[in-house]
């Protein structure tokens, strides 16, 4: 396994880094996901991470096929799963009949995916960022869980056959992590990579506790003989899109990066176009994952195309613009 990791690193030329697009573990917007997958595949991402759902995976693969045909780009496909309750696996809801007629509707304005209108929350467009929950002056918005059960996971894996899987976990959830890891091991799927995503924001623990938790999970996964990725989730699902949000994951990297188990090390959680500026030039991790920031810059273009019942990649000029926007985000991590 370690030799495969080293081979991957050697094949990444110069300062080129591993980059992943996060479409959202509870994002069901298949129209946007197809366009996002096409855009970021063409721009040069290494993997695309989507919800564990057959229709969503099909949309992502369609986007990848488009990019492969025109650009020769074919990133791997990863699905996100969880070993327990997790804020990445949620959606928002409210009863629109309870909204006062004179409400300024801050929830609608703040939603990055345009998932809210007078009918409430469009379930397929909501990916659970939580921004609307905090914005409602009457506290009418709540959340509910959107998660694949362990009972359904084996069948889903066989149907989708993803290239990779990411397990979202928490420091104190080792037993449930073992259960999920065993399902992966007995699935019969030859995964190219297994990613473990964990951070501190959902616990009262410190960096040393996180480090121990990741080593515990390494001892479990090392038997799988699959290259591993350790995703340091600095600011998971905060809903905050400010440039400084990437500081939390960089802080985690600085604290424990050199002591992590063997595998690729990836930053996530609040990452954006400014994150690389918070890193020391001679101390970059193996890669980065972009979620909300990557989707936000494309959403207006995708929505505009969708108004005409078309995909963005059916408009060559607009697609060229989208790819350039994506490349600008990726360039600090990829060879320009």
Regions found by a protein language model. Give the residues of each.
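Conserved mixed alpha/beta catalytic, RNA-binding, or beta-rich assembly cores of soluble enzyme
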Residues: 23-28, 32-34, 45-46, 52, ...
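Alpha-helix-loop-beta-strand connector modules within alpha/beta enzyme cores
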Residues: 7, 54-85, 135, 181-195, ...
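Non-catalytic positions within long, well-ordered alpha-helices that form the structural scaffold/packing
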Residues: 41, 100, 108, 112, ...
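A broadly conserved sequence feature marking short terminus-proximal activation segments
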Residues: 46-114
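N-terminal amphipathic alpha-helix/helix-capping segment at the start of soluble metabolic enzymes
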Residues: 1-24
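Iron-sulfur cluster-binding cysteine motifs and their immediate structural context
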Residues: 104-122, 131-148
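Active-site mouth loops of central-metabolism enzymes
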Residues: 16-32, 82-101, 124, 140-150
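Conserved, mostly hydrophobic/aromatic
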Residues: 40, 60, 165
């Amino acid at each position: 396994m370690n030799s495969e990791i080293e081979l991957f690193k050697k094949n990444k030329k110069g300062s080129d880094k591993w980059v992943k697009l996060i479409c959202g573990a509870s994002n069901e917007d298949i129209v946007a996901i197809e366009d996002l997958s096409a855009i970021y595949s063409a721009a040069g991402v290494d993997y695309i991470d989507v919800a564990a759902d057959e229709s969503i995976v099909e949309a992502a693969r369609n986007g990848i096929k488009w990019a492969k045909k025109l650009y020769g780009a074919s990133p791997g496909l990863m699905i996100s799963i969880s070993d327990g309750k997790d804020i990445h696996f949620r959606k928002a809801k409210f009863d629109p009949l309870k909204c006062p007629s004179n409400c300024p509707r801050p929830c609608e304005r703040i939603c990055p995916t345009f998932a809210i209108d007078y009918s409430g929350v469009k379930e397929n467009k909501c990916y659970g960022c939580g921004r609307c929950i905090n914005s409602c002056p009457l506290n009418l918005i709540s959340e509910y869980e959107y998660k694949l059960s362990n009972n359904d996971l084996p069948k889903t894996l066989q149907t989708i056959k993803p290239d990779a899987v990411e397990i979202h976990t928490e420091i104190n959830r080792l037993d449930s992590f073992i259960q999920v890891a065993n399902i992966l091991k007995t699935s019969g799927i030859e995964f190219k990579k297994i990613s473990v995503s964990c951070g501190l924001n959902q616990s009262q623990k410190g960096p040393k506790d996180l480090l121990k938790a990741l080593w515990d999970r390494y001892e479990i996964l090392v038997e799988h003989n699959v290259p591993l990725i350790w995703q340091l989730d600095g600011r998971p699902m905060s809903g905050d899109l400010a440039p400084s949000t990437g500081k939390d994951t960089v802080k985690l990297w600085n604290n424990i990066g050199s002591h992590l188990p063997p595998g690729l090390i990836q930053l996530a959680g609040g990452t954006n176009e400014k994150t690389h500026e918070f890193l020391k030039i001679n101390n970059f991790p193996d890669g980065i994952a972009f979620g909300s920031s990557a989707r936000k810059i494309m959403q207006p273009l995708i929505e505009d195309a969708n108004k005409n019942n078309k995909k963005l990649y059916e408009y060559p000029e607009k697609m060229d613009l989208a790819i350039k926007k994506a490349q600008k985000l990726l360039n600090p991590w990829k060879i320009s």
